[in-house]
Amino acid sequence: MNQTAGPELARSRRLLTGYFAGLGVVMAVWGARMPAVQNTAELSTAGLALVLLAAALGMVAGLQTGGRLARPACLPTLLTGGAIALAVCLAVLGVCRSLESLLVAAFVFGAAHGVLDVAVNAAAVRCQDAHGRPIMGRLHASFSLGGLTGAALTSATAHTPHTVLFAGVAATAATAAGAATRLTRCLASPGLEPVHNRVAPGLDERGGLSRPRLWLLGTLAAGTLLGEGAAADWAAVHLHDLGATAATSAVAYGVYSAAMAAGRLAGDRLTARFGAPAVVRAGAALAALGLATGLAGSTIAFALLGWAAFGLGLSVTIPSLITAAGIGGPRAVATVAVTGYVGLLAGPALIGAVATVIALPHALLLPALLAAAVAALAPKALEKPTP
C-alpha cells in the first residue's frame, strides 16, 4: 500500500463498514415486522409466502444484474442508487395494503437488495486487495451488528406502527446514502488497485475462476447459508420445544448472531495468521460439533451453547468464500451469492418438511452435517493464491 492510497483506503473501509451495518439494520427491521405487514394487508400464510417469493426472485435478478455492472467505475453509482432504492422500497412496503402491491414492492425491494449486496461485496474485495491483509470478516461483522441493532430497534418500538418505523428507517438510510455520495468515489480510485496480482489454483486460461471451483464455492455458501436460515427460523422453535418461555426462546437467535459477530471481528486476525483454509475448516468443525452436541442435550442451556458454537464456527465462512470468489471478479461474487441464497431460502422449508417426519432435533442435524462437509471441503475451495 502506498502512502497516497492510505487516506483513501481508510475512507473506503469506514464507508463500507457503514454500508454493511445499514444493510443489516434494514433487513432486520423488515424481517422482524413482517407479521405486522401480514396483518395489515390481511394476508394468509400462502399470501405471505408469495410476497417472500417475490422478494427472493427480485434478489436473484438483482444479484445477476449487479454482477454484470459492478465494475470499479460503476461501484459508486451502484452503492448510492442501490441503497436509496432499498430505502424507498422499505417505506413503500410499509404502506402497501394489498397482495398485488406488496408483490411488486417486494420484488423491487429484493432487486435493490441484490444489486447492493453484490456492489458492497465487490467493493469490499477491492478494498481488501488494496489493503494487503484480511478485512472482510470485520466488514461482515458490521452487517451482523447492524442486524442486532435493527432487532433492538424493532423491540424498542414494538408499539409503534410498522409504517412509521419503516418510514423512519428508510429516511435515515436514504439520507445517509445521499450524504455519502461523494465519499463513494474513493471506491473507484486507482489508489485501491490490488497490491499484487493474484493467480490462484483453480483459475482458467482467461484469468477467471474455473467453473468447478466456482461451483464448489457456491455449494459451500449454500450449505453455510442453509445453516444461517435454520438458526433464524428454527432456533427459537427448538428452545420452545424444550420448554423455554417465549422470551427465552427469542434469545436463541440473538445468542447465535452475537457469537457470529464476535467470530467475524476476530476472524481477520486468525485468517492473516493461519490462512483461510485452516480457519474455515476449524470453524466449520466447531459449528458441526457444537450444534450436534446442543441438539443431543435435553436442556435449554445446552441448546443455547450449541447455537452459540454454531454461530461462532460459521462466522468466517461466508467472508472467506466471498474473498475467494472475488478473484474471478463481480460476476463470480454474484454467482456464489445466488447459489448461497438458494440454501438460505430453501433450507428452513426443507428442515420443516423433514421435521414433519422425524423429530425437530434430528432434522436440525442437517445443518450440522453440512457444516462438517464445509470443514472437509474448505481446503480445496480456499487454496491459497500463489504468484
PLM feature segments, named:
Residues 42, 74, 95-100, 275, ...:
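Helix-breaking motifs and short loop linkers at transmembrane-helix boundaries and internal kinks
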Residues 115-130, 315-328:
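Intracellular juxtamembrane helix-capping segments at the cytosolic ends
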Residues 6-33, 107, 211-227, 304, ...:
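Pair of pore-lining "gating" transmembrane helices in MFS-fold secondary transporters
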Residues 32-46, 233-248:
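Short amphipathic helix-loop junctions that connect adjacent transmembrane helices
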Residues 77-91, 100, 278-293:
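Structural signature of the two symmetry-related core transmembrane helices
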Residues 60-75, 158, 263-276, 355:
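Helix-to-loop junctions at the C-terminal end of transmembrane segments
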Residues 164-182, 362-380:
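Symmetry-related core transmembrane helices of the 12-TM Major Facilitator Superfamily/SLC fold
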Residues 37-38, 69-70, 153-159, 239-240, ...:
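Interfacial helix-cap and linker-helix signal at transmembrane-aqueous boundaries
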